[in-house]
């Protein structure tokens, strides 16, 4: 798994979730423009095996989670328009693990999601006004256990 460290000027918010899995970090130089969410089951079920692919160009990509035994059967591609300013969703237990079960991304122009089951404990990563999310970090293994955001001034 690729590991990229955030620039020293970036602030962090989060992570939310549990401490299972291994740490990952994605802080591209270019703006985020696409997030691919992969699920096992249908998109209205849980993100029990979510695989999140963040990208800012064809060569600056990281995929986290989704390495468990269930096949990934559904993919949702989110083409980001604007600056991401908030991440929210649900954390809930799945097979004994507290994991990210649904997720929503909000930009200064629109909302994307929520994707996954609307059940569990809500979480919200909202950054201070005048800033934008420029990268993500967290823990993952079979599941996306935790997620946080790097942010900087617009």
Swiss-Prot record:
InterPro entries: Jacalin-like_lectin_dom, Jacalin-like_lectin_dom_plant, Jacalin-like_lectin_dom_sf. SMART domains: Jacalin. It holds the Pfam family Jacalin. GO terms for molecular function: carbohydrate binding. Coiled coil: none annotated. Keywords: Lectin. Residues 10-153 form the Jacalin-type lectin domain. Expressed in leaves (at protein level). Expressed in leaves and to a lesser extent in petioles. Not expressed in stems or tuberous roots. The N-terminus is blocked. Residues 1-10 are annotated as: Involved in regulating the binding affinity to carbohydrates. GO terms for biological process: defense response to insect; positive regulation of stress-activated MAPK cascade; protein homotetramerization; response to wounding. Belongs to the jacalin lectin family. Homotetramer. Lectin involved in defense reactions of the leaves in response to wounding by herbivorous insects and pathogens. Retards the growth and development of silkworm thus reducing their survival rates. Has hemagglutinating activity against human erythrocytes. This is Ipomoelin. It comes from Ipomoea batatas.
């Amino acid at each position: 798994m690729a590991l990229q460290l955030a620039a020293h000027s970036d602030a962090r918010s989060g992570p939310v979730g549990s401490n299972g899995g291994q740490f990952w970090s994605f802080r591209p130089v270019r703006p985020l423009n696409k997030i691919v969410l992969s699920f096992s089951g249908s998109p209205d079920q849980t993100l029990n095996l979510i695989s999140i692919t963040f990208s800012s160009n064809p060569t600056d990509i990281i995929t986290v989670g989704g390495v468990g035994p269930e096949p990934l059967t559904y993919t949702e591609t989110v083409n980001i328009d604007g600056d991401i300013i908030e991440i929210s969703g649900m954390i809930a237990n799945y097979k004994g693990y507290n994991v990210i079960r649904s997720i929503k991304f909000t930009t200064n122009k629109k909302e994307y999601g929520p994707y996954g089951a609307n059940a569990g404990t809500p979480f919200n990563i909202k950054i201070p006004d005048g800033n934008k999310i420029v990268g993500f970090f967290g823990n993952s293994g079979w599941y996306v256990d935790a997620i946080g955001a790097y942010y900087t001034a617009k």
